[in-house]
Regions:
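Extreme N-terminus of proteins, especially the signal/transit-peptide cleavage junction
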Residues: 3, 30-36, 346-347, 394
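Solvent-exposed loop/linker segments at secondary-structure transitions
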Residues: 47-49, 91-95, 109, 228, ...
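A generic, residue-level signal for flexible/boundary positions that often mark functional hotspots
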Residues: 17, 44, 118, 367-370
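Bacterial N-terminal signal peptides
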Residues: 12-24
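Short linear sequence elements within intrinsically disordered, low-complexity coil regions
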Residues: 8-9, 129, 426
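Bacterial N-terminal signal peptides that target proteins for export
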Residues: 2-13
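Acidic, metal/ion-coordinating pockets
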Residues: 30-317, 376-380
Length: 432
């Protein structure tokens, strides 16, 4: 069994002790120089956020256009960095309306240089056929695309359309990559709760622990053929609560050999990596709010150390990347012509204004109480029924909105078509 020393915390404690004792920091710094260094850049739960979102202070955050700039900057500093994503890259903005026909999400990840991603539950919001169509559209685009890994969530033998699309794209349980003298085994998992949140996916679910044990063993057998130092990374769409509970904590406890879990699905922000045995767990929040960066080093005696861990804000201080802006501008007219035109709407058309900001999505549903945005959406359901039934309208007694389907909010000022769509932007359910 490989034993690694994740000693950032102990190093910090030692440094503080040396300072308290009046000893020079050079005594602490006299450790073996790193022989190898590995940087992993990561995201998850980006949910189609090509464009920035309004923040609580009236500014903006996130967006692929700014994320692309940060990725380029980080790769300039770390040329051998891997760029990984832990799923739910779709469903969250108007760009999802061309998901099955143009695959803008995978084209965007490819344009930003992502090496590998996995599938989250929202990749199945348009069901198995929607995903199959998206995979085929991505391949047909001829654009650079990330590898997709998925070890425990697959089409049944009867779903030939999905099987053919998955094979055509090249979805595998895992991939082996070599970068900067280091070998990486990277695999993907769908969590149990995430599976339950995709009831219409039509996929076959293998328990995560069983799938991980099987896949890690296969990766280890391949990595043993190389003399390179290695890392086994799990792109897990399972999640944690950030406080010691969650499926990814249990995964780390149950499966030996996973060095790093990039934990998606729960939209958790982990300010520091969580260590469970010899496994690190990291998370970078939702909607491209942050770009995660983890740097590890190996010393001559084989010790592995956390050199750096950052959650880099994707905020207004980051300039938009011209190439990603160009790609976004190419997709926006397709959204208008293929989806919005039937409603007589434009992407940035102003529909209304509000003098106050609604509850920020980061604070929404944190406690059980009435909410203005929820009331507005519930009222819109009743209005839609009135419009549909006309003279035959039967009064509705009440309307209910599940908090989980509310995905955005309104800042003070103008409300555009795009803003309105983002608020309730998930795909189809059992009712169509």
């Amino acid at each position: 069994m490989r034993h690694y020393m994740w000693n950032r915390l102990s190093a910090l404690c030692l440094a503080l002790c040396l300072l308290a004792a009046g000893l020079p920091l050079t005594a602490f710094a006299a450790s073996p120089s790193p022989v190898y260094e590995s940087t992993i850049l990561f995201t998850h739960d980006t949910h189609d956020h090509f464009l920035p979102m309004p923040d609580e202070e009236g500014g903006e955050y996130g967006g692929y256009t700014r994320l692309a700039t940060l990725l380029k900057q980080e790769r300039e500093a770390h040329p051998d960095a891997l760029t990984l994503d832990a799923g739910d890259f779709s469903m969250g903005s108007l760009f999802q309306t061309i998901y099955a026909t143009h695959a803008p999400e995978l084209q965007a990840l490819g344009a930003m240089g992502y090496d590998v991603t996995t599938l989250g539950n929202h990749e199945f919001d348009y069901r198995a056929q929607g995903l199959a169509d998206m995979l085929n559209a991505a391949v047909d685009s001829g654009s650079p695309l990330p590898a997709i890994v998925q070890a425990n969530y697959k089409p049944p033998e009867s779903d030939t359309a999905s099987l053919e699309a998955w094979e055509r794209y090249g979805i595998q349980d895992y991939v082996i990559l070599e970068r900067g003298g280091i070998s990486y085994g990277i695999f993907g998992l769908m969590g149990e709760e995430a599976d339950s949140n995709a009831p219409m996916s039509g996929m076959e679910f293998e328990p995560t622990v069983e799938a991980a044990q099987r896949t890690v063993a296969a990766i280890q057998a391949e990595l043993e053929q190389s003399s390179n130092p290695s890392l086994i990374i799990c792109l897990s769409h399972s999640g944690t609560d950030g406080k010691g509970k969650g499926e990814d904590y249990e995964l780390a406890k149950a499966v030996d050999g996973i060095d790093l879990i990039i934990s998606g699905h729960t939209h958790t922000v982990l300010e520091e990596p969580i260590q469970v045995g010899n496994t690190l767990i990291v998370s970078a929040g939702e909607y491209t709010s942050y770009l995660g960066s983890l740097t590890l080093s190996w010393s001559e005696d084989g010790q592995k150390t956390i050199q750096d861990y950052r959650l880099i804000p994707v905020d207004e201080t980051v300039a938009a990347d011209p190439g990603m802006e160009q790609l976004t501008n190419r997709f926006q007219p397709l959204v208008e012509s293929e989806y919005l035109a039937q409603y007589g709407l434009k992407f940035d058309q102003v529909l209304a204004t509000t003098q106050f900001a609604f509850t920020p999505i980061s604070q929404f549903a944190t406690e059980q109480r009435e909410d203005t945005l929820g009331n507005l959406i519930a009222d819109s359901y009743i209005y839609a029924v009135q419009q549909a039934e006309g003279d035959d309208y039967v009064p509705v007694d009440f309307a209910v909105v599940a908090s989980g389907v509310i995905r955005g909010s309104f800042a003070a000022g103008e409300i555009t078509t795009s803003d309105a769509f983002n608020v309730s932007s998930l795909g189809s359910g059992a009712d169509g």
